[in-house]
Amino acid sequence: MSLGRDRYSLPRTYKRVSHAKDKARPELRKFGWETLGYSESFNLPPFRDSIQRVDGNNLTVEEFRRDFERPRIPVIITGLTDNWAAKDKWTVERLSKKYRNQNFKCGEDDNGNSVRMKMKYYHDYMLNNKDDSPLYIFDSSFAERRKTKKLSEDYSVPKFFEDDLFHYADDKKRPPHRWFVMGPARSGTAIHIDPLGTSAWNSLLQGHKRWVLIPPIAPRDLVKPMAHEKGKHPDEGITWFQTVYKRVRSPSWPKEYAPIECRQGPGETMFVPSGWWHVVINEEYTIAVTHNYCSVENLHLVWPKTVKGRPKLSKHWVKRLTEQRPELLEIIKSASEIPLYDMNESSSDSSSSSSSSDDSSDESDCDDSGRCGGRKRKNDDRSNECPEKMSTTYFQNSLV
C-alpha cells in the first residue's frame, strides 16, 4: 500500500490487508496497488442499456426455457429476490457485524491456496481503499463452513434454475458452483466464458454492476486485451474496460459480435447463457450471490466439456444420471457422437476481482477468487486423448 495506516478505522486492518495482498498479488509489491490512480481517474462512459428485462413473477419456467435458455439469450429477471431474507440481511453493516470474525476468500496465492481475510478487516478495507483493482470476496465454500453456512439460508435458488443436473453428482466431486460475492468500486471480473459449458445466474442485493456480454462466436484474440495493453493488471476487469471496451464501442467493431450492455441493480438477477463472453465491474460496493449450473437445455454443451476437462467427474456423473434421470441419456449420447462445440477459446473468471472456472482448455482460466488468466489445475486424467473420440467411447465405458 502506498499510503499509511491511518486510512483504516481498525488498528490491525493495514497489516491484514498487506498480508493478503502479498499473497494474492505478489507481483504488485514493487509496483504498488494505487500507482495508476484509477480511484480518482477511472470513470465508466455513458452507454445504452440493451438487455431485455422480464418480471420473474409473470414468467413461467417453460417460457424462460423457450425464450432465453434454449436460444441462449441473456436476460435480466426482476422480482426473484423479493422474498429473500438476504434482501434485508445482506447489507454491508449487518454482514460486517454478524460475520465480523469469519474469514472469507479474497484471492489465491501462487500455489492455488485460498487467501482469506476476516470480514471486519475486509469491510474496513472495502470502504476505505483507493486501489486500482481492489481485492474482491469471491467465496465458494461459504455454505460448507459452520459459521458462514447461514448465508445459504438467506436465499433460495430461483425456480428457473432449480433443475441443476450437477446435483446428481456427489458434492465432493462436483466443481465449485456457488459464490458469495462482495466488493468495492473498481473490483470485478475479467472477460471470460463460464467453465464446462455451464450457464450462470447472478442475483445482486446491494449496489450496481456494469456488464458487457459478447456472443460465443467472438474469437478470443478479439475480446481479450492485447499483449501491450495488459500492463500490471492483465487479468482484471478494470483493464478490459480501459482497453478492449473502447474497441467494442467503436463503429469498426464487427456487427456479428455486437455486445449486450447493461447496468444491474439491486433485486435484479442476470442470466448468462452457456458460452457467452462476459466481463463485470462494480460501480460501487456490491453484494451478490451467483451460481453456475447445468440444465436439460445446456447438457449437450456441458457433457462433452466435462468429459474432456473433468473425466473422473463425468464417469461418476453419467452413472448417477443413468440411475436417476435415464431420459437424459439420449442427449448425452448425441453429444458424445459429435465434435466438441467450439467456443473459439484455445486456452483455458472471477481477478482479484467474479466467476468460476475450470481446467477445461476452451474457457478462460479463472479461479473462484475472481482472478482470471492465471494458474491452472492439472486435469485429473486422460486429458491428452482426442476429445471427439473420447466423448464417444468414454460414455460407453462409463456405463460398464
Curated annotation (Swiss-Prot):
Enzyme Commission no: 1.14.11.-
Cofactor(s) for this UniProt protein: Fe(2+)
Name of the protein: Bifunctional arginine demethylase and lysyl-hydroxylase psr-1
Pfam families reported for this sequence: JmjC (PF02373)
MF term (GO), any: peptidyl-lysine 5-dioxygenase activity
Residues of the JmjC domain: 146-310
Compositionally biased spans, kind Basic and acidic residues: 378-388
GO BP field: engulfment of apoptotic cell; peptidyl-lysine hydroxylation to 5-hydroxy-L-lysine; phagocytosis
Binding of 2-oxoglutarate, residues: 202, 290
Binding site residues for substrate: 189, 209
Region (Disordered): 342-400
Cofactor binding comment, as recorded: Binds 1 Fe(2+) ion per subunit.
Gene coding for it: psr-1
Subunit structure and binding partners: Interacts with ced-5 and ced-12.
Biased composition (Polar residues): 390-400
Note: Worms lacking psr-1 display more cell corpses than in wild-type animals.
Entry binding sites for Fe cation: 192, 194, 278
Comp. bias intervals (Low complexity): 346-358
PANTHER family attached to this UniProt entry: ARGININE DEMETHYLASE AND LYSYL-HYDROXYLASE JMJD, BIFUNCTIONAL ARGININE DEMETHYLASE AND LYSYL-HYDROXYLASE JMJD6
Subcellular location field: Nucleus
Keyword annotations of the record: Chromatin regulator, Dioxygenase, Iron, Metal-binding, Nucleus, Oxidoreductase, Transcription, Transcription regulation
Family label: Belongs to the JMJD6 family.
Function summary: Dioxygenase that can both act as a histone arginine demethylase and a lysyl-hydroxylase.
Source organism: Caenorhabditis elegans
UniProt cross-references to Gene3D superfamilies, sorted A to Z: 1.20.1280.270, Cupin (2.60.120.650)
Record's GO cellular component terms: cytoplasm; nucleus; plasma membrane
